[in-house]
Amino acid sequence: TMRVLLSLTMLGYSSWVDLKTRELSDMVWLVFGGLGLIIAVYEVYAGSLSLVWFVAVVLLSAALSLTFSFIGLFWGADALAFITLAILHPFYPKGLEPLFGIISPFFPLTLFSNSVLAGASYSLILLVRNLALPLQDRSLFSGLEHEPIWRKLVVLVTGLRVGIRSVRGP
C-alpha cells in the first residue's frame, strides 16, 4: 500500500509540475527512489523481498531506461521516472489482481508497456479533438495550407494548437 501511495504521489506531483513549468527537478526522483530503497531494505530485512531479485529487476530496468534514453526514445526525466518506479514496484503489488490473472515476473516492464498504450491513446484523443475543430469554426492548419498532406496527418494525431502566450519560452 505504501509503495502504491508513494508512486501515485510521485506521478501526480511530477505531472502537475510538468504541466505548469515543463521542468522537473531530479530531486523528485531521488526522494521517491530513496523512500523506495528504504522500504526495500526493510522488506529484505523482514524476509518479504529477495535482495537478488530486487537488484536484478532494478538493474535491468535501469539498463533498459538508459538504453531508451541513449537511442532517443526517452528523455532524462522519463528514464529516471522508470528507474524510480522499478525501485518502488519491483514486483506486482500484493492484493491487486490482474485482469487476466497473468503476472509478469518483470513488473516494471508491465508498467512501461501500459504507459506506452496510455500515451498512444492520447493520440486518439488529439485526433478526435482536432477533427472537431471545424465544428467550432476553428482551424488547425490556418497559415499552414501549403504543408504536404502527410505532415498534416501527423499533426492531426500529435498536434495541439495553442495560443502563443500560453507557451512558456526561454
Model-derived features: positions:
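A membrane-topology feature that recognizes alpha-helical transmembrane segments
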Residues: 1-170
